Design a protein with these regions (language model features):
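Arg/Lys-rich amphipathic alpha helix in sigma70-family domain 2
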Residues: 92-99, 109-130, 155, 207, ...
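C-terminal edge and immediately downstream basic/flexible tail or linker adjoining helix-turn-helix-like DNA-binding
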Residues: 2-15, 125, 129, 141, ...
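Sigma70-family region 2
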Residues: 47-48, 74, 85-102, 121
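Amphipathic, Lys/Arg- and hydrophobic-enriched alpha-helical face
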Residues: 58-76, 93, 166, 215-219
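Helix-turn-helix DNA-binding module
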Residues: 160, 164-200
Length: 230
């Protein structure tokens, strides 16, 4: 996320920056305090159902949320419908957010629950049991403000092709990779979103990376002028 943009929307108290300048607390502690203040401001605004705040949150998180839903569903039309429904839930149930956790963790949890609900309504397998993507699942393109660690690692690959490769992974592996490398959540935060034990999250991340490597190698080998690995 663009931290400069966030600072324009949610300003931390002056006392935090003053304390940093005097050196009484570390920069990391100051950043933590700023995030906590931002979360508290969001929680306060959501309890009041502030429409201006919702517009600001959509502007800040729209690309990340839609990308996450695209990876979970593999279908743009479905992802866009769930995108709208997620923000409706945020507005209607905003009082449930207490500001103790990062807002994006709470946001992705809502989105994931909607995907699971839709799967059940359509008599599909649950998210934890879905098989690999079918033939109707297509690669996608979505604008992002800055490259993630995974995108930087794969900077020489076509975005649509990378999306296609990720859609070939088992959904539970794909989800953890997206949350870790695209959304940059910590392993503990991923455990919160997926409601899985931390040990399970670590295992899925390891297995997902192991499964991704040969697929990426096949993608590079299929190119007539494949570049050397980074």
């Amino acid at each position: 996320m663009d931290h400069s943009t966030k600072r324009r929307v949610f300003s931390a108290p002056e006392s935090v920056s003053d304390t940093v300048q005097t050196g009484s607390i570390t920069l990391a502690a100051a950043q933590t305090a700023q995030v906590q203040n931002e979360n508290a401001a969001i929680a306060h605004g959501l309890k009041r159902q502030n429409p201006e705040l919702l517009d600001q949150l959509i502007e800040l998180y729209q690309h990340r949320l839609l990308r996450y839903l695209l990876f979970l569903t593999g279908k743009r039309e479905v992802a866009e419908d769930l995108f709208q429904e997620t923000w409706m839930r945020v507005l209607l149930r905003g009082a449930q957010y207490n500001g103790k956790a990062r807002f994006d963790t709470w946001l992705f949890t809502i989105a994931r629950n909607l995907v699971i609900d839709l799967s059940r309504k359509r008599i599909m397998a649950s998210l934890d049991e879905m098989s690999e993507g079918g033939e109707d699942e297509r690669p996608f393109e979505i604008a992002v403000s800055a490259p993630s660690p995974l995108e930087q690692f794969q900077s020489r690959e076509d975005c649509a092709e990378v999306g296609e490769v990720l859609l070939k992974l088992e959904p539970t592996y794909r989800e953890v990779l997206v949350l870790r490398f695209y959304e940059e959540l910590s392993l503990e935060e991923i455990a919160t979103v997926t409601r899985a034990p931390l040990s399970t999250v670590k295992s899925r991340l390891y297995r997902g990376l192991a499964a991704l490597k040969p697929l990426m190698e096949q993608l590079r080998a299929a190119r007539p002028f494949a570049e050397a690995e980074i």
